[in-house]
């Protein structure tokens, strides 16, 4: 499998072209967990798969977190994918990239610099209910609770149905401990 390892503002990302659909979608999470593991493989913060466009973009980008879960978007990754798209002839200096969060526009500023226009947030609901591990929590304002494996604030977007998220940064996992140092 050919890949590019890219870096955008401190995030290191792996990019793979799968416009030919050579790898079944259900295989990606296992592949991603394996290749993103630091010290044991290539290691990366995230993984992007380039696919054929489906709704008017130059190409489609699927973003995955290093644990294999699909994410909607990564701004630093969007700039990387624009450079990849330009350098591989998928798009010109101005390009439209399809993401699960919507269409993103990217511009080539110079040889190494790319700018992106991320899509606007649709709406935010500051109250609601979240079910985590069988317990229901009511939210009144956005908060991140380290003892709860969830973010109690949802951004509603027409491109993605509301669903409980199960994978979070290790700092917010209920079983993690984050030291502050001496």
Regions found by a protein language model. Give the residues of each.
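Short acidic, glycine-rich loop/turn motifs
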Residues: 65, 99, 118, 132-134
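A structural-propensity feature for long, helix-poor, extended segments
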Residues: 104-121, 125
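Active-site-proximal beta-strand elements of phosphoester/diester hydrolases
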Residues: 115-117, 138-140, 149-153
């Amino acid at each position: 499998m050919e890949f590019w390892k890219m870096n955008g503002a401190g995030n290191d990302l792996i990019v793979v072209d799968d416009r030919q659909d050579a790898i079944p979608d259900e295989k990606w999470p296992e592949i991603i967990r394996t290749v993103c593991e630091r010290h044991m493989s290539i290691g990366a913060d995230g993984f992007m798969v380039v696919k054929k466009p489906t709704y008017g973009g130059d190409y489609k980008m699927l973003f995955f977190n290093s644990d294999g879960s699909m994410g909607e978007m990564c701004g630093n990754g969007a700039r990387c994918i624009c450079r990849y798209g330009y350098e591989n002839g998928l798009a010109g200096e101005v390009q439209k990239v399809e993401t699960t969060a919507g269409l993103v526009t990217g511009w080539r500023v110079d040889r190494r610099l790319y700018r992106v226009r991320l899509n606007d947030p649709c709406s935010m609901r500051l109250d609601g209910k979240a079910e985590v591990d069988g317990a229901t929590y009511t939210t009144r304002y956005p908060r991140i609770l380290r003892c709860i494996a969830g973010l109690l604030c949802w951004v509603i977007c027409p491109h993605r149905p509301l669903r409980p998220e199960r994978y979070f940064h290790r700092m917010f996992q209920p079983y993690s401990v984050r030291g502050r140092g001496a």
